[in-house]
């Protein structure tokens, strides 16, 4: 009997597979982008690998800068060139301005009530205006200058105590960004609280998980069996409990504070923006700031120091610039940064080679549209491979894979959404509204690190290729912590 069941199941699988390939062959249309062959049920999911940005870049080299894949039942456009990204994020920006639904995002971010993940519409416009006009203005960014200076000074003191020893730069930079963002958004630091650190680790891991049910709904039971559903529920509840306590403490505390929670509560209380902001929206926006602001800035600084340590000639040139401008000063102030052109070039080059989100948060088309000769139906997801665009030889030349900050010194290309060959923060309506906040922290941190100390890699890491290996997840960090030998210049 068992043998007969196996034969029947095998025959059924073979029959479905044959039907799939017949349908795929007959259904191929000339007005759709090129597509790699796909498997029944899962489509092209098997081709993503551990590092989807690299796998998709390899596929685009074969099938072109605009590919149509299927992740389970979901059609997904993969964009791997600046020209096509311009079409998506500028020419047809409104059509592609929405976000696809995701169980992970909805469970964690209050049914996508935040700014980064909310579907395009009136609610999203209202929440974005709150962020742009009240939380992330140039005035607000400047107002937290002392916070940045204080936390950088504390980091430098930690380094001073480790002189001539190996320093874990990854740990230091992670703590710095966590402390700065926590003080700005939540009003105080949480780096000494084990529960908070563990919660952030769980959250970061979950955001990089693959949710089967999102792409193959009738296989959603796999997410339950794998434990993903349980992890989402627990982490979502723990985050809400934490954020609720933060908001409650602010309501009961000093009304004169000006961190982000206080600003949002004041807007809610005074009804000063012309629409209601409820408690869930406040918590979702704060979660956006904490998650997005901490991980991305930390990753960029970690990769910048990685590249500089592996290229001492670049590090020496940066040190020469910073030390010349700040000669006689014990530290670098934010006012000094404006004249540091090579520093800005180093940061641009890091963003080009190591965008913190190599695959940008997916977009989704809200109506049918034509991209060149291709018909793109409503409901199509779009994945823009910022990592591949930053390494496109047609744009950056034959040395596109090489870290060479000099390429930016006489270039007008910037990362603020106007030049589509460099889009680490996105572009168009969905561009990250916190660019200025992130960049000033990155600039002043790197400048102080190279101004006060000399750095070199430990001998055992110089030729070790695993020392530049990537982690997995939504935000790409180093696979292993970055260690460096430090010595004071004084």
UniProtKB/Swiss-Prot annotation:
Gene Ontology molecular function terms on file: heme binding; iron ion binding; monooxygenase activity; oxidoreductase activity, acting on paired donors, with incorporation or reduction of molecular oxygen
Protein's UniProt keywords contain Nucleotide-binding: no
Domain of life (superkingdom): Eukaryota
Classification via Pfam families: p450 (PF00067)
Gene3D superfamilies in the cross-refs: Cytochrome P450
Obligatory cofactor(s): heme
CDD domains registered for this protein in UniProt: CYP71-like (cd11072)
Family recorded in the similarity comment: Belongs to the cytochrome P450 family.
Amino-acid positions noted as binding heme in the UniProt annotation, renumbered to this chain: 432
Keyword Transmembrane: yes
Location relative to the cell: Membrane
PANTHER family, per the entry: CYTOCHROME P450 71A2-LIKE (PTHR47955:SF15), CYTOCHROME P450 FAMILY 71 PROTEIN (PTHR47955)
Alphabetical keyword list: Heme, Iron, Membrane, Metal-binding, Monooxygenase, Oxidoreductase, Transmembrane, Transmembrane helix
Ranges that cross the membrane: 2-22
Membrane topology, as annotated: Single-pass membrane protein
CC annotations in GO: membrane
Species of origin: Arabidopsis thaliana (Mouse-ear cress)
Annotated EC: 1.14.-.-
Protein's name according to its UniProt entry: Cytochrome P450 71A22
């Amino acid at each position: 009997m068992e043998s007969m069941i196996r034969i029947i199941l095998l025959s059924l699988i073979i029959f479905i597979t044959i039907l799939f390939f017949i349908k795929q062959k007959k259904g191929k249309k000339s007005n759709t982008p090129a597509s790699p062959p796909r498997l029944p049920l899962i489509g092209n999911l098997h081709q993503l690998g551990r590092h989807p940005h690299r796998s998709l870049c390899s596929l685009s080299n074969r099938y072109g800068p605009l590919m149509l894949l299927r992740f389970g039942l979901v059609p997904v456009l993969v964009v791997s060139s600046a020209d096509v990204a311009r079409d998506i994020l500028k020419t047809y920006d409104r059509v592609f301005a929405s976000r696809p639904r995701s169980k992970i995002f909805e469970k964690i971010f209050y049914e996508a009530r935040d700014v980064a993940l909310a579907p395009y519409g009136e609610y999203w416009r209202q929440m974005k205006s709150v962020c742009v006009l009240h939380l992330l203005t140039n005035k607000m960014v400047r107002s937290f200058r002392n916070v940045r200076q204080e936390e950088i000074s504390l980091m430098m003191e930690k380094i001073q105590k480790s002189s001539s020893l190996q320093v874990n730069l990854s740990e230091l930079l992670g703590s710095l960004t966590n402390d700065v963002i926590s003080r700005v958004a939540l009003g105080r630091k949480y780096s000494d609280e084990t529960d908070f650190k563990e919660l952030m680790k769980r959250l970061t891991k979950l955001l990089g998980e693959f949710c089967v049910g999102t792409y193959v709904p009738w296989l959603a039971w796999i997410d339950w069996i794998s434990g993903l559903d349980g992890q989402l529920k627990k982490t979502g509840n723990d985050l809400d409990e934490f954020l609720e306590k933060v908001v409650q403490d602010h309501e009961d505390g000093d009304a004169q504070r000006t961190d982000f929670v206080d600003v949002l509560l004041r807007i809610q209380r005074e009804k000063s923006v012309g629409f209601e902001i409820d408690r869930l929206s406040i918590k979702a926006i704060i979660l956006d700031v904490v998650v997005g602001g901490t991980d991305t800035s930390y990753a960029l600084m970690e990769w910048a120091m990685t590249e500089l340590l592996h290229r001492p000639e670049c590090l020496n040139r940066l040190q020469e610039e910073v030390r010349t401008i700040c000669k006689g000063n014990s530290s670098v102030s934010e006012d000094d940064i404006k004249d540091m052109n090579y520093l800005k070039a180093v940061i641009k080059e890091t963003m080009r080679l190591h965008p913190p989100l190599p695959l940008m948060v997916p977009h989704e088309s809200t109506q049918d549209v034509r991209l060149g000769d291709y018909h793109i139906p409503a409901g199509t997801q779009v994945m823009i491979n910022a990592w591949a665009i930053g390494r496109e030889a047609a744009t950056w030349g034959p040395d596109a894979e090489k870290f060479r900050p000099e390429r930016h010194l006489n270039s007008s290309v910037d990362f603020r959404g106007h030049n589509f060959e460099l889009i680490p923060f996105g572009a168009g309506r969905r561009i990250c509204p916190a660019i200025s906040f992130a960049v000033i922290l990155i600039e002043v941190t790197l400048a102080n690190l190279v101004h006060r100390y000399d750095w070199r890699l430990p001998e055992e890491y110089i030729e070790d290729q695993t020392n530049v290996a990537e982690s997995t997840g939504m935000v790409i960090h180093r696979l292993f912590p970055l260690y460096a030998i430090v010595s004071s210049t004084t």
